[in-house]
From Swiss-Prot:
Protein name in UniProt: DNA repair and recombination protein RAD52
Organism classification: Eukaryota, Fungi, Dikarya, Ascomycota, Saccharomycotina
Compositionally biased spans, kind Polar residues: 235-245, 269-291, 304-324, 489-499, 521-545
Compartment list: Nucleus
The organism of origin for this protein: Debaryomyces hansenii (strain ATCC 36239 / CBS 767 / BCRC 21394 / JCM 1990 / NBRC 0083 / IGC 2968) (Yeast)
DNA-binding positions: 171-175
Amino acid sequence: MNTNNNSSGSNGPTSNSASSMYNYTHFKDTKYKNAQGTPNRNFQPVPYTEEEHQRIQYLLDKVLGPEYVSFRPGGGGQKVSYIEGWRALNLANEIFGFNGWCSELISSQVDYFDTHGNTGRISMGLSVVVRITIKDGTYHEDFGYGYIDNAKNKAMAFEKCKKEAFTDGLKRCLRCFGNVLGNCLYDRTIISKIQKVRLPAPELEADNFHRDPLIVQREMKKKQTVGVNIHESAENNTDNTNNIPKGNDDNGATNSNENNSNNVHSKQKNSATSLQTPISNRNFNIPNSTSQHRDNNTKPRASHPSQPGGPQQHSKTSSNNTPAPKNYDIVGDFDDSLVFSDDLPMDDDEMSHNDGLDDYELQMLIHKNRQNGGTDDPALIARSSYAENNENSNSSGEVNPTNNSVQEIPDQPALFVSAKRADALQQAPKDATKIPQFDAKYVSPNIRRTLDHSKSVPVRRSEISQAPHDKPRTNIGPPKLLNRASPGPTISNSNTNNLGKRMIGLPPSQKPPYKRRHQDASLSQRSKPDETSQPSSKAVPQDTNPSKDKENQPARVASSKNLEDINNMAQVT
């Protein structure tokens, strides 16, 4: 350990021009330590009791669990096990108590301090000696080391090295007390077992957080306010259900029922198809016990036929044929949103008021009633049609107390028929059994089929190539050059795909021959005398003998044939 001091007597670096290294003196301050290096403060050790001694010894003999051990890559592709500094401090507080141990920095020394040229980067290494003392006076000392390479400045280098060195010395001192403080990490058998254990991800709970008391108090008040509001809303709901009046079963609805039932109105739809019984005629009867159920044995409503005789007569029949008030038994606690909803379900009798009419039929009835001088009220029209249907059904002797207007037609089975038979089936649906059904599996003998469509099997390529309708296509090769003139190659429009590209414009057979850009030197020389024969005839007298002209004519024809052959070759290429 280097203990050289500078000339001023204070702790500081001594320059060394040879190695550019700074050596710091040993930490010795008379304020904290005396000349012998022992603490100058008054320390009174307190011995452990027998129970405390056994408890601490029992905990120190245990082995660290896998949640306390960490791994980092080491040399040779191996992993190095270690315990993190904050975990070691928590274990020391758990075993010795938060006031049962203390740590001291005994000495600090800079091993090397290098500056890298003009870059200002710093590399240094620092070692410290740390002592840990427990309550009964037992202590352990060990060294710690910290280093850094290429630090930006001195402050960063010293901060990192001192913290790393002190933490390293602290962990090395604690491991001297027992296995649970890190000494078990040097046993490879224990490490091999720890590596096989897989831990679940840690879950943090709200109770484990240390919160600000003011924030916690605000959150508690907010929760209480929300709870009170929910409780008050629940009480209001129960009060509203208890305030629903009881209906009068014999004499109809009372005045109070009418006032309350006006609030319970059905949803008024934009279309005229919403023909429901007015909600004012409904009575809600709340039983005293929760075991009472709805009475399903309701009497069918008597139908009174009406005779269409004008608008006044329609209004009378509508007032006389108002349905009897119904009692809805609401059992026990119920939700207000169900009772005071706009979408209350209709009974069978109420559904019969619509008479199975859709929008189109209802509009037709309104239009017809206008022509007859009747009313435009869709409810009255629907009720009149309902009464007429009841009258017709009663006259025929058929009685249906629940739904007299709608006569269900038995469902006909689905049939497959041909297009010719479809019109006949629509005109006479009762004769569906007489019409022959269409056989979807019928195979016409006039259509040649190369594959069996009745089953799903893989098709080989050879079977497709041997199909009877696939005829081999012959590739048209270049035309042979003959001594006589021959037209260019003709390509049919059906086999244009054999050309290998998409043809645009006229087909090749109708295109004009390509322009001959290059000509043989011999042919050009051979054709020159023929072309220049006319100008030369002016200077030389021509022979008028026809026999000589006939002798010269085949030579000219031969030369023209040669030119046509050359044109054909150019088109092929």
